[in-house]
Amino acid sequence: MPASLLDTIESPADLRALPAAELPGLAAEVRAFLIDSVAGTGGHLASNLGAVELTLALHYVFDTPRDRIVWDVGHQSYTHKILTGRRDAMQGLRQRGGIAGFPRRAESEFDAFGTGHSSTSISAALGMAEAFHQLGSDQRAVAVIGDGAMTAGMAFEALNNAGATELPLLVVLNDNDMSISPNVGALNNYLARLMSGRFYAAARRAGDKVLSVAPPIRELAKRAEEHMKGMVTPGTLFEEFGFNYIGPIDGHDLDVLVNTLRNIRHLRGPQFLHVVTRKGKGYTPAETNPCLYHGVARFDPAAGVAEKRAGKPSYTEVFGDWLCDMAASDPRLVGITPAMREGSGLVRFSQEFPERYFDVGIAEQHALTFAAGLACEGVKPVVAIYSTFLQRAYDQLIHDIALQNLPVTLAIDRAGLVGADGPTHAGSFDLSFLRCVPDLVIAAPSDENECRRLLSTAFLHDGPAAVRYPRGCGTGAAIEPGLEPVEIGKGVCRRRGRDVALLAFGSLVAPALTAAERLDATVADMRFVKPLDVDLVGELAAGHRLLVTLEENAVAGGAGAAVAELLAQLGIVVPVLQLGLSDVFIEHGDAAAMLAACGLDAPGIERAVSERLAALPE
């Protein structure tokens, strides 16, 4: 006999068989399961605890998987996974061979669209709604998007497009940054039921039809309706986009959610439902500090997440300390982040230099062009951005920064593999797409101290420059307190050997040094991907039988390709082995294990080099 309601749910069909009165009890069970599950695996907790009731209501009302639900970003999709046959698989969440932390089309028919980056859901759901229209299907498409993701321009581009259609698209705004008083909440819950009801919709259409013969009167009536709704709801903006706005409603009241969604399901045209939720709902530590519990490692639910112990600083912390030190030295410095203050190490800077700190929201394109405008007038911007999110601002980097040779520093965090977050968040491609941009200096530090020095080099350079560094801690190198730069385009030889020269970039210098001890190989810390150290490459090519390039980036178009191109330009013929990330998307898992699986740990490097050496003619 099942011990709980949750044990009876293997699919949304089982959920829809329950009486609505049992949903609150199921929500409590799901919440308890989430806390225990994420405590054992790590993952996103606060956002998932806040979306339990909303997820239950959506699957209860809509005929999934026939109807499509697109989860923006996707880190709030754990309840969705639990309800769609993956409850037992949650024990392997974000681990190698286990289920992903984000929706994946290849993982389940219920995952309508793969996500990981923000603000894509409305565009994708609109495309699905149009496809259903083209195919003559009555299927429905729903986009669930958070308030943070609504800061991105792409979301508004999609709203603008959708509002001009008559497609039955539903956009659900999961607003966990808005407080709602009991009185206003009760009023809005009532109005939501009214505005989503068939009578209201029918009366609205009939009135519009009657007044169509008198456009001035119709416009007056429309404005009067917007004024009345605007007195108690904040939805005028979405009405202007052409949506029927409903809400805000309590996102933890299942009765209100289910009834409102049932009404909306039968409405014509684009609908916008504003739902207010609380991050960390049901787990006091997460409610108190949702930022700390946004993404967590394994923890004891009874004790909560432990603060980080003192130890080796992460590259992110090295950057944050450097930024504050350089800001104290140069009053022209400003720091910019696209909604990643904590993740990019800008907390201390934001506190010590609040007038020089800019969080522009999830708006990477704007962040770079904003930086370009600052640089035009003599300010020195530093943009702290994840490698994977820099992809979204590629045109701005080329057109607005590099083309004008503006002194903007890009501090590129999470370069290379990122472990449990998987391919949507990996920084596998930045060297490949950056090194073809004219006038852009690209550096990759091998340890914490070199990271600090290369950041100073980039900042003091009179042109665009990028420093890319990995997630996590470095080698434990002693960090010098100064702000001295290094010479641009010059590497350093770390070890002298024979036959083989390992040209290592960034994070792979350390495993290269370990492998070199067994191979008796030369190791060069190249430091710069662009410009390359021409003299060093030529010297190493002249004195070794085999050159091996090492990078935590895609081999295609990466640093190794740059070395091969340089050798061709110089007319030097020497065997080159390029080691890096192969031409596949690297799945989620422990970062060190994934690097080893790619053959980029010391044993893997030794093995690959030995095999190539053995194949060379004597």
Swiss-Prot record:
UniProt gene name: dxs
Pathway: Metabolic intermediate biosynthesis; 1-deoxy-D-xylulose 5-phosphate biosynthesis; 1-deoxy-D-xylulose 5-phosphate from D-glyceraldehyde 3-phosphate and pyruvate: step 1/1
InterPro entries assigned: Dxylulose-5-P_synthase (IPR005477), THDP-binding (IPR029061), Transketo_C/PFOR_II (IPR009014), Transketolase-like_Pyr-bd (IPR005475), Transketolase_BS (IPR020826), Transketolase_C (IPR033248), Transketolase_CS (IPR049557)
Cofactor(s) the protein requires to work: Mg(2+); thiamine diphosphate
GO biological process: 1-deoxy-D-xylulose 5-phosphate biosynthetic process; isopentenyl diphosphate biosynthetic process, methylerythritol 4-phosphate pathway; terpenoid biosynthetic process; thiamine biosynthetic process
EC number: 2.2.1.7
Family annotation (PANTHER family): 1-D-DEOXYXYLULOSE 5-PHOSPHATE SYNTHASE-RELATED (PTHR43322), 1-DEOXY-D-XYLULOSE-5-PHOSPHATE SYNTHASE, CHLOROPLASTIC (PTHR43322:SF5)
SUPFAM superfamilies linked: Thiamin diphosphate-binding fold (THDP-binding) (SSF52518), TK C-terminal domain-like (SSF52922)
Role of this protein: Catalyzes the acyloin condensation reaction between C atoms 2 and 3 of pyruvate and glyceraldehyde 3-phosphate to yield 1-deoxy-D-xylulose-5-phosphate (DXP).
Residues the entry annotates as binding Mg(2+): D147, N176
Full protein name: 1-deoxy-D-xylulose-5-phosphate synthase
Subunit structure: Homodimer.
Family: Belongs to the transketolase family. DXPS subfamily.
Entry-linked Pfam families: DXP_synthase_N, Transket_pyr, Transketolase_C
Cofactor annotation remark: Binds 1 Mg(2+) ion per subunit. Binds 1 thiamine pyrophosphate per subunit.
Binding positions for thiamine diphosphate per the UniProt entry: H75, G116, H117, S118, G148, A149, N176, Y283, E364
A GO CC annotation given for this chain: cytosol
Cited CDD domains: TPP_DXS, TPP_PYR_DXS_TK_like
Catalytic activity: D-glyceraldehyde 3-phosphate + pyruvate + H(+) = 1-deoxy-D-xylulose 5-phosphate + CO2
UniProt keyword annotations, A-Z: Isoprene biosynthesis, Magnesium, Metal-binding, Thiamine biosynthesis, Thiamine pyrophosphate, Transferase
The protein's enzyme class: transferase
Domain of life: Bacteria
